Amino acid sequence: MTKWKRANPNGTRDYLFEECTLIEEVEQKLRRTFLERGYEEIRTPTIEFYDVFAFQNRPIDEEKMYKFFDEKGRIIVLRPDMTIPLARVIGTQRGDIPLKVTYSGNVFRANESLTGKYNEIVQSGIEIIGIENVRAEIECVISVIQALQKLKVQSFTIEIGQVQLYKCIVKKLPINDEEEKLLRTYIESKNYAALSHFIEEKKLNRCDETVRLLEKLPRLFGSLDVVEEAEKLASSNEMKMAIARVKEIYETIEQLGYGSYISIDLGMVQHLDYYTGVIFKGYIYEIGEEIVSGGRYDELIGNFGEMMPAVGLAVQVNQIVKALQEQQEPYKRKRIDIMIHYELNRLAEAERLRNLLQKDGKNAQLSLFSNLNDTFQFANKNKIMTVVEAKSESLVEYVWREKWIIQKEGEASCVTFKLR
């Protein structure tokens, strides 16, 4: 039963050394930015009851969840989403409203094989609870733009869409749930030919304003001109209000000087059914992968308690790291300046010397070897030019000059030795 002991499960991988450090740095910079903007931290368990995700419309496919049983036979899942557990917390432990929260953690979804998607990813995000007006969406977009700027991510854009517009259109069409899922796929993928065929097959009236808007929806992406085009075809007040909200958000963010970071895509339709209004997606041009996703979900928290308006977005940390690795100089570990070799009875003195050298800006580290020659070999291999030996009665500094030679030798006190 040891066939797989040397392998990783499908869709997972190990993160080593520099890449692991970069993931941590990205998480911490995002965290600091969000905390500076007044968000408070929340952490939820990595495991949740299956029932947390099994409500009406089932926003996450059951097949995508990692499921197992607890000691009482209840179904447990590895969290496939961060927003739903946060909605559970807010709905069951309501605090002061409005509330701005931030989080970071791993999310697990079983993707199909050979899709190139990982089943375990790191997400950092923000949620604003209790605000209905556009200030919530604007705050979310500004927060993520500033966070990406501080990470020095280049060439990114945040697309603003409106799922409410799509839902208004679908309500007027004589189609069932399965056909709606198909329609959503065509629009999201901007498959113009398939959408046109769908309209013909369902015998939808192309002279009707709603059908004309539906057919144009995948093409309505860019700047404010697409909003004006959509407004001309909007056949209800609900549609017009949905479009006007996108326009107001775009214009406000543009006035702040962030116009180059945003665009509009009215054909963007999120696959998660809990979104009810404005939605977001962020991309980096070079990698073409989604780095930000989110939107308004005014009905989600009601599944766990009182109905409350909410907006949020998640940053895909792994994709940010991938982009930074491609856009910037490779991350390099800080070079070790001095290795300190010590006898066990001199560990305290060696540690004091290391601390003194660190305060002087030198990266000094204790050797893990018991033999001085092994320390010399390690230093040579890692291009460390100085080794200090903490012997029983003295401290000896060696430097590399085609061979290891004694630079100085002195008192047992690390302070006196360092000053010489």
From Swiss-Prot:
Enumerate the subcellular locations listed in this protein's record, separating them with semicolons.
Cytoplasm
Q: Name one GO cellular component term.
A: cytoplasm
List GO BP terms, alphabetically.
Answer: histidyl-tRNA aminoacylation; L-histidine biosynthetic process
Gene3D superfamilies this protein is in? Bira Bifunctional Protein, Domain 2
Has UniProt tagged this entry with the keyword Hydrolase?
A: no
Q: Which UniProt keywords apply?
A: Amino-acid biosynthesis, Cytoplasm, Histidine biosynthesis
Q: Which Pfam families match?
A: tRNA-synt_His (PF13393)
How would you summarize the oligomeric state and partners of this protein?
A: Heteromultimer composed of HisG and HisZ subunits.
Q: Extra notes?
A: This function is generally fulfilled by the C-terminal part of HisG, which is missing in some bacteria such as this one.
Q: Which NCBIfam families match?
A: hisZ_biosyn_reg (TIGR00443), PRK12292.1-6 (NF008938)
Function according to Swiss-Prot or TrEMBL:
Required for the first step of histidine biosynthesis. May allow the feedback regulation of ATP phosphoribosyltransferase activity by histidine.
The protein here is known as: ATP phosphoribosyltransferase regulatory subunit
